Regions:
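C-terminal structured domains
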Residues: 246-332
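Long, hydrophobic alpha/beta structural blocks
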Residues: 2-282
Length: 332
C-alpha cells in the first residue's frame, strides 16, 4: 500500500477547538508513511466495518468528483471534510482530543480514507543533566498520543474513487437528540449494509434460536452453519443466509420456514458482504458450555466425524459428550 497524500486536522473537544492544516503531511518520511499505511491496511480488514455506496450528488460526493477532475486541491478537500466532521462531532462527542488523518491511499485502486485517531495520555522518559554534572532520568507525560497501528482507530472510512464504494466503522453518537452514525449518516450521507461480524452473528443466532425452539441443542446445526460460512469465504466475498438455513434445516421443512421468517424479519433474504478472512476464522472452532459449567472448544469439522467427538442422549434424557482417540491431554 502506498500513501500518496495525507493531511492532519486536530479536533480538541475539551475546548471546542479545531485546527485545520494548510499543508500536507510529509508522507515521504518513511515513519509517517508506515504509520498511516499500517492503520489503513488493518482497518480494511476490520470485520466490524459496514459497506455502502457514496452518491456522487451528495455534498461530499460532489467534492470527490471535483477532486478527481483536478478542480479541487487535496488540502482543500481535507479541510472541507474536517470542517463538516467537527460541526457534527462537537455536538455528539465527549471531551477528548481526536486527530483526524485524511489520506489518499493506493492498492489496486485509489481510496480517500478518513482515520479518526482518539488521542490518549502516555508517558515517556527524558534525560536531564543536573547542575553538578550528574545525570537524572524522569518520566514525562504526553497528553495527546495517537494510537499505535496495533490499536484500533476510533472510526474509519474508505471511499473507492473508482466506484465510490465505502467501508466504514464508527461508534454511534447523539446529534440533536437522535442517536446516529455521525460519519455515515451526517457527513457522508450514505446508507450501509450491516458489518460482517453482525451478519455472521445474526445467522448463528437465528440457527440457534430455531434449533432450540424445536428441541435441539443446536450444536450440529451451528457447526454446519459455521462450516458453510467458512467454506463459502474461500470463493466469495458475500454470504447467502437463505442458502445456509436451507442446507442446515434441509431435513426439516418446518424449521427451514421458521428460519427464513427470521431472516426476512432481519432483512437478510439476500447475499450480504462478508470479510473473507473473518468468515474463514468463524469456521475454525466451535465452543459449547454445559449447565454443569464444563466448556469444550473443538474444530468445527469434528462434528462430522464420530471418531473424535460425539454427543449422545442417555436413557434418562441427560446428555453425554464422548471425546475419542485422544493420546495426550495438556493443561492450558
Amino acid at each position: 500500500m502506498q500513501i500518496n497524500k495525507a493531511a492532519l486536522e486536530i479536533f480538541d473537544f475539551t475546548s471546542s477547538l479545531a485546527v485545520y492544516s494548510e499543508h500536507e503531511l510529509k508522507v515521504g518520511d518513511q515513519a509517517i508513511q508506515d504509520y498511516i499505511a499500517n492503520h489503513v491496511a488493518k482497518a480494511f480488514k476490520d470485520p466490524g466495518a459496514r459497506t455502502g455506496t457514496l452518491h456522487d450528488a451528495s455534498p461530499f460526493g460532489k467534492q470527490l468528483v471535483e477532486y478527481k477532475k483536478g478542480d479541487l486541491k487535496f488540502i482543500d478537500l481535507s479541510k472541507n471534510l474536517g470542517e463538516s466532521l467537527f460541526t457534527y462531532m462537537k455536538q455528539a462527542t465527549d471531551s477528548v482530543v481526536i486527530d483526524t488523518i485524511i489520506c489518499e491511499a493506493v492498492t489496486d485502486t485509489t481510496y480517500i480514507c478518513i482515520l479518526l485517531c482518539q488521542a490518549h495520555d502516555a508517558f515517556t522518559h527524558q534525560l536531564f543533566s543536573e547542575d553538578d554534572g550528574t545525570l537524572a532520568t524522569e518520566l514525562v507525560s504526553h497528553k495527546a498520543v495517537l494510537p499505535m497501528p496495533s490499536q484500533k482507530l476510533r472510526a474509519f472510512a474508505s471511499i473507492n474513487l473508482h466506484d465510490f464504494s465505502v467501508r466504514i466503522f464508527e461508534p454511534k453518537g447523539e446529534f440533536d437528540g437522535e442517536v446516529s452514525y455521525i460519519l455515515a449518516d451526517k457527513v457522508l450521507q450514505l446508507g450501509t449494509n450491516q458489518s460482517s461480524r453482525d451478519t455472521v452473528k445474526k445467522v448463528k443466532a437465528i440457527v440457534d434460536k430455531v434449533s432450540q425452539a424445536h428441541e435441539s441443542d443446536g450444536v450440529v446445526e451451528l457447526t454446519t452453519a459455521k462450516s458453510m460460512i467458512a467454506k463459502n469465504a474461500e470463493v466469495s466475498d458475500t454470504v447467502d443466509p437463505v442458502r445456509i438455513v436451507e442446507e442446515v434445516f434441509k431435513a426439516n421443512p418446518i424449521q427451514q420456514e421458521a428460519a427464513k421468517k427470521e431472516l426476512a424479519d432481519a432483512d437478510m433474504m439476500r447475499p450480504l458482504p462478508v470479510n473473507r478472512e473473518f468468515a474463514t476464522k468463524v469456521g475454525e472452532h466451535h465452543k459449547i458450555k454445559t449447565d454443569t459449567g464444563i466448556e469444550i472448544s473443538f474444530p468445527v469439522e469434528y462434528m462430522k466425524n464420530r471418531e473424535f467427538i460425539e454427543i449422545k442422549t442417555n436413557d434418562d434424557g441427560t446428555l453425554r459428550i464422548e471425546l475419542k482417540n485422544i493420546n495426550k491431554i495438556m493443561n492450558k
